[in-house]
Structures are given as C-alpha cells and as structure tokens.
Amino acid sequence: MQVLVNKIWYEGHPLRWLLLPFSVLFALITAIRRSLFRLGLKSQTPLPVPVIVVGNITVGGSGKTPTVIYLIELLRQQGFNPGVISRGYGADMQGVKVVTAADSAASVGDEPAMIVARTGVPMVVGAKRVDTAKALLAQFAVDVIICDDGLQHYALGRDIELVVIDGKRGLGNRHLLPAGPLREGAWRLNQVDFVVVNGGPAQANQYEMQLSPSAVLPVNPKAVAVFDPTQPVVAMAGIGHPARFFETLTQQGFQLALSHGFDDHQAYDKEVLCELAASRPLMMTEKDAVKCRDFAQENWWYLAVDAKLSPQFDQQLLSRVRSVAAAKQGKSHGV
C-alpha cells in the first residue's frame, strides 16, 4: 500500500487525478477549521513560556525528531530549560503521560521514546497538545516548550513555527491529501517563522540542515560485541522515507547485503527481524532501535545521527526565543 501511495504522491501516478475531488473536500474542511480559529469561534490557548512548534506540511517523516533534539541541545547550551510535548503517535495510552527512559515505544510513541532516551528532556505526551503543555508546566520547571509535530493543532498557542521539509522529496506533487502528501498548501510556508530543508538546497529565507552520522551503537544496551565495519550488514528502516537511510549507509561506506523498508511507526516482531538478519549484523535507525531494545540481539546496531544547522539559524532562533520570553515575563509582571 505504501509503495502505491509513494507513486501517487511523488512519482506522478495517474491515480492522483481520481483522488483530486477528495483533496478539494479536504481543502474545504481545513479552511473552515482555520477560519473558526481566526474568527475566534474556536479558541487558541496561550501559554506563559515561549512555545516552538516543530512540524511539517507533508505526511510522513521529514526530519522533525532530529530537529527537536537539536533545539533541545541548543537551548540548553544557552541556559534555557526546555521541555517537549508530543501526540505520542501510536501509543497505547489515555489522557497525558510523562515520558521516562524506562517507557517503551509502544506505551509513549516512537519519537518520544527516542527523544527522551537521547536527551533525558522533560516530556509529556497526549492527544490534546494544550493538556500536555499544561501538564508539562505543572510538573517541571521548564521555560521553553517545544511541540514535536502539531503545526496543524491550532488550539495550542504558539510563538514560533518551524517547518521541516524533506530536501530529497520536497512537497511531492504539491496536492493536498489524499491526492498528494500535503496537510496544508505550500502557501503555509510563507506564514511560518523558519523553514528548514533537510538534506537539500535551501531557497531564500530557508535554512539547510544536514543529518550527520555520529556513531554506530548496539541496540541492546547490555551488548558487549564490537561492530566490524568491514562486514556486510542487513539494513532496515521503519521511517517515512527508508531509502534516505539506506543511501546514508552507502555514503558512509557500509556494504549492504540487503535493505528492507518497513512502514513508519510499525511494531516489530523479534522472529521476523531475526529471520531478516539471518547471521549478518542488522543495522537500523535510532528510531527503530527504541522499539527493538527489549529483544535486540548482540549483532543488532543503529546509526545515530546529529542535525547540523548554520550559526545564522542558531542566532535567529535564539534571538526570537529571548524576545518572546522577555515579552511574556513583562506581561506576567504587569509591565
């Protein structure tokens, strides 16, 4: 199914024309929804600290999670104490939940499990972003909130909007769902504060981001094996665009005996992965690793990557955060 969807959205498959009437309906529904917020018929909840929403206007992975991790580290380096909220897509939960390093991806979602495992940041997940933000502020002394995804969740007040675009696939055929991958039209890029292009050339007023491989690490934290870079690996990825990961491995000099893409957010079965790997090392993404760590074998590995952005981006982002923080502190003191 995903193969057909990708052909429709990114390869010009003619079936897209049959889906266009549904895209028109989707456009109408989303336009009405935005109008309700703009006219004040639906309310947006402001928060007492700066809120950065990291999202995209397309369906599927674009590099939001590495961007969130980058922002966490950048803000911490400048003395801020950020916290993160997320939907926790696919999580088996009700209400809101504080994410801990002991939580499984099944209980809190793939991305939250990965973010907390990497950074230890205060994080709360839940279906309603406003409720998760309030819970985060109630339980942790955070002074900046980063919302992982949620660009279209207009009930959450936000001060900075950052959109991540896949530099390889772009906006696909530029049609709205379901004929294309767009959640909102390309016009939305002109309204956000920052547009970050992951792995591709940035246009004027956009910022280029590269994902730089940093280390090969064991999926099983108790494993004592040492990775042999001369040995061919079986590569797997359950992300929005698996081919990007396989291309990265090849560029880094890995020999791929086999590559296999899974659906994004897919749960994994130990037996299936053992059969896939056979006797060879299994190489996966960091997001996949958090779903496999409880049953990982000695020769299962993941490639950690770090987002790299320009000093100009850092300067502009931090300047905006400080400005918003000062304004909100002034309001709280009646200035």
From Swiss-Prot:
SUPFAM superfamilies: P-loop containing nucleoside triphosphate hydrolases. The gene is lpxK. GO terms for cellular component: plasma membrane. Pathway: Glycolipid biosynthesis; lipid IV(A) biosynthesis; lipid IV(A) from (3R)-3-hydroxytetradecanoyl-[acyl-carrier-protein] and UDP-N-acetyl-alpha-D-glucosamine: step 6/6. It catalyses: a lipid A disaccharide + ATP = a lipid IVA + ADP + H(+). The keyword Transferase applies. Signal peptide: none annotated. ATP binds at residues 58-65. Pfam families: LpxK. Belongs to the LpxK family. GO terms for molecular function: ATP binding; tetraacyldisaccharide 4'-kinase activity. Transfers the gamma-phosphate of ATP to the 4'-position of a tetraacyldisaccharide 1-phosphate intermediate (termed DS-1-P) to form tetraacyldisaccharide 1,4'-bis-phosphate (lipid IVA). This is Tetraacyldisaccharide 4'-kinase. Keywords: ATP-binding, Kinase, Lipid A biosynthesis, Lipid biosynthesis, Lipid metabolism, Nucleotide-binding, Transferase. Its EC number is 2.7.1.130. GO terms for biological process: lipid A biosynthetic process; lipopolysaccharide core region biosynthetic process. Transmembrane segments: none annotated.
